[in-house]
C-alpha cells in the first residue's frame, strides 16, 4: 500500500503510514527510504536528512540509505558529505548502480570529468540503459572524447532507435556537409505520429544543424523555428513573470545596499567569474584563462546559483537577510564558508574559474561574500547572441525563454537592465 501511495504521489500518506510501521520495527531500511524520499519530493530536504540519519543510527546500514542521504546532501550543496555517503554506499555494495550514477553526477558537477567517467563506466557495465548511455555520452563530450562518444551513440541508436535525443547528440559531433545518411533517417522519423513534442524538438534541432552544415540556410531556418515552437509547447506551466520578478527583486534588494558594510572575507578569494548571456563567448574566454597553470577551469559550476536558491527559497528568507542592518555576521559567515568549501572541492589550491553565464544575476552577492573575486563580463553583439541562443537546444523549464522570440527579447532586455544596474552600483 505504501508503494501505491508513493507512486500516486500521496506523500503525506506515505509518511504517516510509514512512521506507524517504524514504531513496531525500526530496522526497515525500505520504510525509511519511503519517508525520506517523500520529504525530498515535498522539497523538505532538512526532514529527509534527519530521517536518513535516524535510519543509520538505528543500524539500517544499507547502500540505498547512504545513497539517498548523499542525494539530499548534494541537493543541500554539502558536497563533501555527499561524496562520503556515496562512497560508503559503494563500500556496502560496490555495484549499487544509483550510487555509481550519483557519484558520477557529483564529480561531473565539479568538472572532475575523468573521475566521473570511472563511475559512469562502472554503471554502464552493469546496465546499458538509455539513462546510463546518456550520461556516458555527455561525459565523453565534456572530456572532448568525440570518437568515443560517437561509438556509444551508435550503440544507443541500435538499441533504442525511437529515442530522438541520441539523434541530437549525434548531430553535435557529426559534419553533414557530404553525408545525407543520418539526415535522411531523421527526416523519415519526423513521419512518426507517435513522437512527443519533446521527441520532435530533438529531431528538429538536429535536422536544422545538418542543413546548416550543408549551407541550406532556408531549410535550416525552417527547422530552427519548428524546433523552438515545438520545444516551447512542452513548457505548459511556464510563466515569464517569474523571471521578471527575480530581476526586479534583485534590484530592489541592492538599491540601497551599502557594500562598505558587507562581510569581509579572509582575502583569499581565489575565484574568477565569467558572466554574460549564453552564447556570448564565455566558453572561449574560459578556455583561454583556464589554460593557465594556476587556474582550475570549473566550467559552468552550479554552486553559486544552487546555494542561493536553496538558502533563499522564498522572498521571506531573502528579505530577512537584507533587513538586518548590518547583516548578521554568522549568517554571512555560514553562507560564505559553505560556498567557499564547495568551490575548494573543484580544486583546493588553484584559482577556480566559474563560467556559469547566469551568475550575472548574483553579482551583488559575489561582492558581499567575495569582494576580491574577479568578475569578467562577456558582451557580444546582442543580435548575434540572440540568434545563437535561438539556434541551440537548452534543457530545463527555466530555459523556456530561449524557445520564444518574444520572451528571448524580453529576457535580453532584463539582462541588459540588470547589468547596467550593477555597473552604476559598483562602478
What are these language model-derived features?
Residues 3, 33-41, 64-75, 98-108, ...:
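Conserved alpha-helical positions within TPR/SEL1-like repeat arrays
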Amino acid at each position: 500500500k505504501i508503494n501505491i501511495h508513493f507512486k500516486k504521489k500521496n506523500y503525506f500518506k506515505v509518511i504517516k503510514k510509514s512512521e506507524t510501521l517504524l514504531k513496531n520495527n525500526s530496522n526497515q531500511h525500505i520504510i525509511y527510504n519511503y519517508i525520506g524520499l517523500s520529504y525530498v519530493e515535498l522539497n523538505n530536504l532538512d526532514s529527509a536528512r534527519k530521517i536518513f540519519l535516524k535510519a543509520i543510527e538505528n543500524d539500517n546500514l544499507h547502500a540505498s540509505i547512504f545513497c539517498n542521504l548523499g542525494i539530499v546532501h548534494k541537493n543541500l550543496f554539502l558536497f563533501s558529505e555527499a561524496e562520503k555517503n556515496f562512497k560508503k554506499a559503494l563500500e556496502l555494495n560496490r555495484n549499487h548502480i544509483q550510487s555509481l550514477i550519483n557519484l558520477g553526477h557529483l564529480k561531473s558537477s565539479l568538472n572532475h570529468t575523468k573521475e566521473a567517467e570511472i563511475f559512469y563506466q562502472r554503471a554502464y557495465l552493469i546496465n546499458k540503459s538509455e539513462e546510463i548511455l546518456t550520461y556516458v555520452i555527455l561525459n565523453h563530450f565534456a572530456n572532448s572524447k568525440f570518437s568515443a562518444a560517437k561509438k556509444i551513440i551508435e550503440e544507443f541508436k541500435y538499441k533504442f532507435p525511437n529515442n530522438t535525443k541520441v539523434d541530437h547528440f549525434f548531430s553535435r559531433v557529426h559534419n553533414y556537409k557530404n553525408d545525407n545518411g543520418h539526415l535522411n533517417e531523421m527526416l523519415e522519423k519526423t513521419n512518426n505520429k507517435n513522437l512527443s513534442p519533446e521527441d520532435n524538438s530533438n529531431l528538429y534541432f538536429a535536422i536544422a544543424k545538418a542543413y546548416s552544415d550543408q549551407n541550406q540556410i532556408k531549410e535550416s531556418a525552417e527547422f530552427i523555428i519548428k524546433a523552438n515552437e515545438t520545444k516551447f509547447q512542452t513548457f505548459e506551466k511556464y510563466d515569464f513573470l517569474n523571471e521578471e520578478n527575480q530581476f526586479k527583486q534583485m534590484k530592489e534588494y541592492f538599491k540601497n545596499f551599502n557594500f562598505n558594510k558587507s562581510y569581509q572575507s579572509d582575502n583569499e578569494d581565489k575565484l574568477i567569474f565569467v558572466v554574460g548571456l549564453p552564447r556570448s563567448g564565455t566558453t572561449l574566454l574560459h578556455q583561454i584563462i583556464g589554460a593557465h597553470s594556476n587556474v582550475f577551469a570549473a566550467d559552468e559550476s552550479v554552486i553559486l546559483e544552487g546555494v542561493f536558491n536553496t538558502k533563499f527559497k522564498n522572498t521571506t528568507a531573502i528579505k530577512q537577510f537584507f533587513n538586518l542592518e548590518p547583516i548578521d555576521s554568522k549568517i554571512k559567515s555560514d553562507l560564505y564558508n559553505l560556498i567557499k568549501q564547495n568551490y575548494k572541492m573543484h580544486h583546493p589550491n588553484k584559482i577556480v574559474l566559474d563560467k556559469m553565464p547566469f551568475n550575472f544575476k548574483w553579482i551583488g552577492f559575489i561582492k558581499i561574500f567575495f569582494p576580491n573575486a574577479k568578475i569578467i563580463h562577456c558582451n557580444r553583439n546582442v543580435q548575434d547572441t540572440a540568434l545563437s541562443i535561438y539556434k541551440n537546444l537548452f534543457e530545463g523549464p527555466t530555459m523556456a525563454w530561449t524557445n520564444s522570440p518574444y520572451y528571448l527579447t524580453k529576457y535580453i532586455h532584463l539582462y541588459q537592465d540588470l547589468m547596467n544596474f550593477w555597473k552604476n552600483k559598483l562602478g
